[in-house]
A protein has these predicted regions:
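His-Asp phosphorelay/catalytic-motif detector in bacterial-type signaling
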Residues: 76-83
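Alpha4 helix (beta4-alpha4-beta5 surface) of REC/receiver domains from two-component response regulators
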Residues: 64-66, 70, 83-111, 120
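C-terminal output helix
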Residues: 114-126
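Extreme N-terminal starter segment of soluble prokaryotic enzymes
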Residues: 1-4
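Acidic, metal-coordinating helix/loop segments flanking the phosphotransfer/catalytic sites
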Residues: 34-51, 61
Length: 129
């Protein structure tokens, strides 16, 4: 079973993802209670996830792409094998969606999804990481 840590602010969205991941029987998903980088690192030390799924928004400095990438740099120092996946709303934030795509192209992250992704595709893609 793959351990996956989820740092997504939207409660409805994260609950839907948790439900779908649990249904497959392939994942042990854990919702991280905070978006603060220090708290994410502390939680990840406890969970030791194989995948970290995070949302990216311009709402808070911690959830911007810059904030998330900075946190991932620290995370990968401790957990180099942990895959990092970002989720963003391509309709509300088209420029941010482009930045996330460029982060993947630059190999700063292992994967990304847009908010319009179906849960089936999300689960299948995470299984393949």
């Amino acid at each position: 079973m793959k351990r996956i840590a989820i740092s997504i602010r939207n409660r409805v969205f994260v609950e839907s993802i948790l439900f779908m991941l649990k249904q497959t029987g392939e994942f042990h998903p854990v919702r991280l209670p905070s978006v603060w980088p220090e708290r994410i690192l502390i939680e990840c030390r406890s969970i030791q996830p194989e995948i970290l799924l995070m949302d990216v928004t311009p709402a808070q400095p911690e959830t911007t792409i810059e904030g998330r990438l900075k946190m991932l740099e620290k995370l990968h120092q401790e957990f180099p094998e942990c895959k990092s996946v970002m989720l963003c709303d391509e309709t509300a934030y088209p420029e941010l969606a482009q930045d996330v795509m460029h982060a993947k192209q630059s190999r700063l992250i292992d994967g990304f999804f847009y908010a319009s992704v179906t849960t089936g595709y999300l689960v299948a893609s995470l299984s393949s990481l």
